[in-house]
UniProtKB/Swiss-Prot annotation:
Protein name, per record: N-myc proto-oncogene protein
Function: Positively regulates the transcription of MYCNOS in neuroblastoma cells.
InterPro entries: bHLH_dom, HLH_DNA-bd_sf, Myc_transcription_factors, Tscrpt_reg_Myc, Tscrpt_reg_Myc_N
Gene from which this protein is expressed: Mycn
Localization of this protein: Nucleus
Organism: Rattus norvegicus (Rat)
Record domain bHLH: where: 379-431
UniProt signal peptide: none
UniProt region (Interaction with AURKA), positions on chain: 19-47
Lineage summary: Eukaryota, Metazoa, Chordata, Craniata, Vertebrata
Recorded superkingdom: Eukaryota
UniProt modification remark: Phosphorylated by GSK3-beta which may promote its degradation. Phosphorylated by AURKA.
Interaction with AURKA and FBXW7 as annotated region, ranges: 61-90
């Protein structure tokens, strides 16, 4: 029998009988740690799961960066993310291609923000501490802070140049200055930093960027330097032009200044179509008793001028057209079926009937109006109701007359129609038998008469 103690962890004793005979014992047992598999009153694991194992989330590291000569190598990934990426923007040809070559003298100090993708709860304090230590160690105290946090989201600093999804952008040719304080008048206008032509859709989101400056993380508020807005890369993979995402605000605390629906609105076209069901025409075929529903759909192109306001997320409205399936009730008379198309009712004919039973059908005036008009439908229904009422009255009077001619049911006013039909059939059969007997008796009497006439003739001749 294999031992219950795991080979990899000899100090742990198996308490679960289900895992007792397993050849490979797990490292964590359901009954060992109440943090994972606790009772119904236990709380689910939260952010302190990393404190329990003394681990930190390890995001994918950016490419290796070239650091200034006086600055030491980064000790961890958090410090490396905060350092400028100099090898990306070392080529002057690339700077001239993006129009950023003359932006180096606008502001004297670029400070790179943390990676907006990895600004979680557990890494935020480590990033703060790394920035403060970096600034105090090589670049001076961070106490003197600038007083322009509003343009920090949409503005860029002197070397503020970013490419693609890299959150660390910008560099300086010389060493960083020791004094980080800047007057509010030297804050850079976003229009000066980004001279690229932008469309109407993206320019609408630029004024909203300064108002969302408090949404940045604690790293920005502790250092208090102008933030850098990354320029969207041309080869982003979404198929949009390079200037479609130039003025998007950067939020490093996980709170996006633009909602998720903005990205969905960017993918929608300016010219959309609205489909409305205009006319519904219903026809009923009397031959096959099936409802035929015709939907007339008109398509109107809607050109919406997208100004400062956002487009609604569901402008493309498509009303679903569901065909109406109606089951014909064969027991009830259809109002669409005319009385001429209905099968003729069988009339009970009796030889003793005093008058012929007829169903008076007035000639139907044929109208040239369409079949779907309200006047035609109402007139047809009215004529059908009149004819149906007259037919029922004639049928009732026929049963009453037949009942009066049957001797057994003359005084029975509550006789059912089935009883009337049965008694009338028996009475007709009895009358036919009596008629046959009377015919035989008549033939005998005629033969007797012929014999008597012959005798009388013979007596005269003698």
């Amino acid at each position: 029998m294999p031992s219950c103690t795991a080979s990899t962890m000899p100090g742990m004793i198996c308490k679960n009988p289900d895992l007792e005979f397993d050849s490979l014992q797990p490292c964590f047992y359901p009954d060992e740690d109440d943090f994972y598999f606790g009772g119904p009153d236990s709380t689910p694991p939260g952010e302190d799961i990393w404190k329990k194992f003394e681990l930190l989330p390890t995001p994918p590291l950016s490419p290796s960066r070239a650091f200034p000569e006086h600055s030491p190598e980064p000790s961890n990934w958090a410090t490396e993310m905060l350092l400028p990426e100099a090898d990306l923007w070392g080529n002057p040809a690339e700077e001239d291609a993006f129009g950023l070559g003359g932006l180096g003298g606008l502001t004297p100090n670029p400070v790179i923000l943390q990676d907006c993708m990895w600004s979680g709860f557990s890494a935020r304090e480590k990033l703060e501490r790394a920035v403060n230590e970096k600034l105090q160690h090589g670049h001076g105290p961070p106490g003197a802070s600038s007083s322009c946090p509003a343009p920090g989201v949409g503005a860029s600093s002197s070397g503020g140049r970013a490419l693609g999804g890299s959150a660390s952008a910008g560099r300086t040719g010389a060493t960083l200055p020791t004094d980080l304080s800047h007057p509010a008048a030297e804050c850079v206008d976003p229009a000066v930093v980004f001279p690229f032509p932008v469309n109407k859709r993206e320019s609408a989101s630029v004024p909203a960027a300064p108002t969302s400056a408090p949404a940045t993380s604690a790293v920005v508020t502790s250092v208090s330097v102008p933030a850098v807005a990354p320029v969207a890369a041309p080869a982003r993979g979404s198929g949009r032009p390079a200037n479609s995402g130039e003025h998007k605000a950067l939020s490093t605390s996980g709170e996006d200044t633009l909602s998720d629906s903005d990205d969905e609105d960017d993918e929608e076209e300016d010219e959309e179509e609205e489909i409305d069901v205009v006319t519904v025409e219903k026809r009923r075929s009397s031959s096959n008793n099936k409802a035929v529903t015709t939907f007339t759909i008109t398509v109107r192109p809607k050109t919406s001028a997208l100004g400062l306001g956002r487009a609604q997320p569901g402008e493309l409205i498509l009303k679903r057209c569901v065909p109406i399936h109606q089951q014909h009730n064969y027991a009830a008379p259809s109002p669409y079926v005319e009385s001429e198309d209905a099968p003729p009712q069988k009339k009970i004919k009796s030889e003793a009937s005093p008058r012929p039973l007829k169903s008076v059908v007035p000639p139907k005036a044929k109208s040239l109006s369409p079949r779907n008009s309200d006047s035609e439908d109402s007139e047809r229904r009215r004529n059908h109701n009149i004819l149906e009422r007259q037919r029922r009255n004639d049928l009732r009077s026929s049963f009453l007359t037949l009942r009066d001619h049957v001797p057994e049911l003359v005084k029975n006013e509550k006789a059912a129609k089935v009883v009337i039909l049965k008694k009338a059939t028996e009475y007709v059969h009895a009358l036919q038998a009596n008629e046959h007997q009377l015919l035989l008796e008549k033939e005998k009497l005629q033969a007797r008469q012929q014999q008597l006439l012959k005798k009388i003739e013979h007596a005269r001749t003698c």
